[in-house]
């Protein structure tokens, strides 16, 4: 007797600047997911936060329509229960998708999901918290200065001095909560700092000013829950001065070298650090960990972790696993299985906690 297909709600779109990137990732997943095991049902979250029903979501995913303001949303929670959806696969990058907010909603309605939980997502999205987590785990990071909007508005001169005393030029100025290099500026002079911070503050009220280094950019994919594994490393050779949003998604002048041309020892170091970074933020399911390898010194620095990395067939995350002998359809299958596994364990712990409370109540 054939086993029942798992019903998977493929969540895509979202409210962030990476809405269109999410559509590309979702399209690739839907096309490649093993049809014998999964029924993939697309659910688009419009730019204003409305959940669109499957028929309208299908039109958006196929490229024949956009989520218009006049489209009516629907009750996702009621639909999940009515259709007996088994698991959600959120592939929404950036704010309100990768930062723990969507994950918290899925926890509340009791729907299993692929990827990191609330805490891992939130820490992985916020570059301040991420850096603090890496530092607490004694992982190598580039020197940085955190700048809040409130501090910047109240005393720009003091903060400028703090930055100039703590870091060497050039600097990279980044919003703390934005993906795909949105709002990032490379600053080559002290006079350029105010404009770069103002630009970053358009995207978030927290900014990271980081020491710029002349480095190779290398990435490692991580997969798993309690026993995560790391892929072979891959290198990005940027077509611009640094690997920014335009280079990633518009001009596409960068190239990927997979596997990266590294010594066996350096490759193993990166894989070990990638797993350590994954654990440091409390991630699960999948993440991509980005590194700098400084030219001249060959020192390795952790740049950041992405808990919902780009997931098209040509994105770095799946390409690294393909080079590690895990094909794209099998990778999707593994991620859904990991989501189900994680949800089962969380439910068992929750049920155990509730039984304990009931036992305590019965004694009073």
Across the structure, where does each feature detected by a protein language model lie?
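ATP-binding N-terminal substructure of ATP-dependent carboxylate-amine bond-forming enzymes
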Residues: 1-119, 123-125, 129, 148-158, ...
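Active-site nucleotide/adenylate-binding loops and adjacent lid/helix of ATP-dependent enzymes
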Residues: 2-12, 16-17, 82, 123-216
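ATP-dependent carboxylate activation and anion-phosphoryl transfer catalytic cores
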Residues: 2-6, 138, 263-364
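Solvent-exposed alpha-helix faces
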Residues: 27-28, 198, 275
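Hydrophobic beta-strand scaffold residues
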Residues: 40, 112-113, 141, 171, ...
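A glycine- and small-aliphatic-rich helix-loop capping segment at beta-alpha/alpha-beta transitions
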Residues: 104-113, 189, 194, 323-324
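Phosphate-binding site of ATP-dependent enzymes
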Residues: 185-272, 295-301
